[in-house]
Amino acid sequence: MLVDPASVPTAVPDPVTPALGDLLVSAWESGALQAALDVSPGAATPPVGPVRAELAGVGESFAAWRLAPLPSMPSAPTAMTRPTAPTGKTAPTGPASFILRVPHVPVSALPRSLAQEIAALAHAPTGVGPAPVGAHDDASTSPLGLPVVLTADVPGAAARPSSWTSAHLRSHAHHLARLHSVPAPGRGPVMPGPEPWAAVPAGPQSLLTEVEAEAEGWRAAVIGAPDVSGLEPLIDAALARVARIEPQIAQLDGFVLSHGDLCATNILWDGVDVAGRPAVQYIDFEWAQGDDPARDLANLGGSVHGGPWYVPLTEEQVAGFVGAYVDARAALAREAGSGELPDSVADVGALRERMRAWTAYDRMAMLAHVASRAAESEMHRRVLPQLRGTLAAELGLPD
């Protein structure tokens, strides 16, 4: 990676404004952006040439820009075209399009380095998520003045939580089983290089220590926020729910590569696959790491929901979703000749108990975030009472 100091801007545009798009086009067409990337192993450096940039979406931490090469641009190298998804579709023959994501929150607030996100994508089965291209973590030497992560584009759109059907749940269960077919030795990030699990601590794993530390952040985040009365009992109840599964986490025998933030907004749908199911892929792997498979299962939704993130599901629907996932994991294990499922998946009762603890953890974290944003965001202000009410009901507390 070589960075020309002259390519680093002296003023950094807001990541969601047209000024950033203009700077992005300039950096791409000059080749400065490509030169700055730490390219993922097996990926080719994106070609230099004319490109159109458009804001594809804004999430809780990142703004995503779509880069569409213009027709005069030479075709991208084969390694950079979008991989064929497991849907029977053919990969595009023309230039690939790309998604470049830039954080609109402080880098210190991100759960992982961007290089670790790219490493996780490189470790995932082909077609589960976007093909990784590369990242640049250092804002001071970035041609945009911001950290960047670049992947191939993924077709499709997120479905509204209220529009999910049983077919969506089955497709998601099968796709998630493919992601979780990658084993991990414990809870921790995926590292670049030849030893992807080098940062996973040895010995018994823990979740409670992480949640206890997060709880201090939740309390700090909502100080002075409007309409946050009653959050302290929710925090205590969430901690108690996690404490009950700590012995399971310490003895768990089947950690996997986990997406870590697999809510509805990070699940894209595009037509149907060869089996006639809705075709699905995942995006935004910034939380990806080795973890308990129950985490991704819980993040979809269930009884605790609100906003665009969580799918409201009955107990019967959750049971069907989990059953489809377990069956898909078993089928993949048979195909691979790897024998029986680990108890972390085969013991469905224990899996469901851990899902309930992960639900308490994840929704409490989101509730604290939503409460901290409610004063400045009408959407977060609207979501706050529903998310708080459904979490309180799940934890057996009055709203």
How would you label these PLM feature ranges?
Residues 1-18, 74-92, 399:
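Actinobacteria-biased recognition of intrinsically disordered, low-complexity terminal regions
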Residues 16-46, 182-260, 270-273, 347:
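An alpha-helical support segment within catalytic cores of ATP-dependent transferases
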Residues 34-49, 70-96, 272-277, 330-347:
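Intrinsically disordered, low-complexity terminal tails and inter-domain linkers enriched
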Residues 54-84, 89-202:
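ATP-binding pocket architecture of kinase catalytic cores
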Residues 56-69, 99-100, 240-295:
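Active-site acidic catalytic loop and adjacent metal/ATP-binding pocket
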Residues 197-200, 204, 355-368:
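Hydrophobic alpha-helical segments that form the core
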Residues 294-337, 359-377:
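Active-site activation/catalytic loop segments of kinase-like enzymes and analogous catalytic loops
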Residues 340-343, 365-399:
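Helical subdomain adjoining the active site within ATP-dependent kinase catalytic cores
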